[in-house]
Curated annotation (Swiss-Prot):
Organism listed in the record: Streptococcus pyogenes serotype M1
Gene: guaC
Family statement drawn from the similarity comment of this UniProt entry: Belongs to the IMPDH/GMPR family. GuaC type 2 subfamily.
UniProt xrefs under Pfam families: IMPDH
GO cellular component terms, semicolon-separated: cytosol; GMP reductase complex
GO terms of molecular function: GMP reductase activity
Protein name per Swiss-Prot or TrEMBL: GMP reductase
Coiled coil ranges: none
Record carries keyword NADP: yes
PANTHER family attached to this UniProt entry: GMP REDUCTASE
Domain of life: Bacteria
Residue positions binding NADP(+): 205-228
Keyword NAD included in the entry's annotation: no
Lineage: Bacteria, Bacillati, Bacillota, Bacilli, Lactobacillales
Function: Catalyzes the irreversible NADPH-dependent deamination of GMP to IMP. It functions in the conversion of nucleobase, nucleoside and nucleotide derivatives of G to A nucleotides, and in maintaining the intracellular balance of A and G nucleotides.
Length: 327
């Protein structure tokens, strides 16, 4: 029964340290395997237009990080796959569920991407199940990520349809206002929703949304995530595609949600907003810091790799009064 599960979010949890068994944090292995491939970190920059573009995707792939290209420039996806493969890099793209996407997927048979993410706000839907089946029929070797969902029932249905991983999180992101506009979602209890969904999953879970600090990555892994999708922490870099804006001599980058009017181009069914983030240096610096912090997390967990994080104890401290958005 849902009402019987503990409800908490990232700021309500503290992980409990174990005896350290490594002599240097640099010995901690932060790598993760997804499908047939190994990546340096269990993090994914959100597949949003103000977070990732083709240049950043190439940079990430070359350096051994996982990425998911957004779906908002439909005509560029096929040339993008070709260009990545010509460089010996993996191709990871997004699709929606409109009728035209079925034809697009079929057209990829001659040069199939390694990863396809079905990317819609409410992923527990017949339209998503139908698209999973279509991709698996047309491109059986492609790894399919489906989402977004927020319940164990949704995870099981998408896995049963053929999804290789599911993305958990409805509305917890910094520029997502689904919870306010609709009354639905995992905002405010994203970590508990992740735990609930992961217990039902037989395949990898990707936690998506609500990450405000690097420590939240470790918490996500503790509660069942194989990988963590992050928006705001990856926004605002010099390389970020978001428009640069100057206010009182200080530079900012635009960051907006995929369901915002800025993305849609019209004020219809809006569930996202736009914010300005102070420009904060280079993406590579953030990735390095994330890795170092995660290595520290592994050392506190008393292990040598990410799996050690899954076995630590935790306490619920109920610091909900501390709003993660203020960090």
């Amino acid at each position: 029964m849902f009402n019987d599960i503990p409800v908490f979010d990232y700021e309500d949890i503290q992980l409990i340290p174990n005896k350290c068994i490594i002599t240097s944090r640099s010995q901690a292995d932060t790598s993760v395997t997804l499908g047939k491939y190994q990546f340096k970190l269990p993090v994914i920059p959100a597949n949003m237009q103000t977070i990732i573009d083709e240049t950043i995707a190439e940079q990430l792939a070359k350096e051994g990080y996982f990425y998911i290209m957004h779906r908002f420039d439909e005509d560029s996806r096929k040339p993008f796959i070709k260009r990545m493969h010509e460089q010996g890099l993996i191709a990871s793209i997004s699709v929606g569920v409109k009728a035209c996407e079925y034809e697009f997927v079929t057209s990829l048979k001659e040069d199939a991407p390694e990863f396809i993410t079905i990317d819609i706000a409410h992923g527990h839907a017949n339209s998503v199940i139908d698209m999973i089946k279509h991709i698996k029929t047309e491109l059986p070797e492609t790894f399919v990520i489906a989402g977004n969902v927020g319940t164990p029932e949704a995870v099981r249905e998408l896995e049963n349809a053929g999804a290789d991983a599911t993305k958990v999180g409805i509305g917890p992101g910094k520029v997502c206002i689904t919870k306010v506009k609709t009354g639905f979602g995992t905002g405010g209890w994203q970590l508990a929703a992740l735990r609930w969904c992961a217990k039902a999953a037989r395949k990898p879970i990707i936690a998506d949304g609500g990450i405000r600090t690097h420590g939240d990555i470790a918490k996500s892994i503790r509660f069942g995530a194989s990988m963590v999708m992050i928006g705001s922490l990856f926004a605002g870099h010099f390389e970020s595609p978001g428009k640069t804006v100057e206010v009182d001599g200080e530079t900012f980058k635009e960051y907006y949600g995929s369901a915002s009017e800025y993305q849609k181009g019209e004020h219809k069914n809006v569930e996202g907003k736009k914010i300005l983030l102070p420009t904060k240096g280079h993406l590579s610096d953030t990735l390095t810091e994330m890795q170092q912090d995660l290595q520290s997390s592994i050392s506190y967990a008393g292990g040598k790799d990410l799996d050690s994080l899954r076995h630590v104890d935790y306490v619920i401290v109920k610091n909900s009064i501390w709003n993660g958005d203020s960090i």
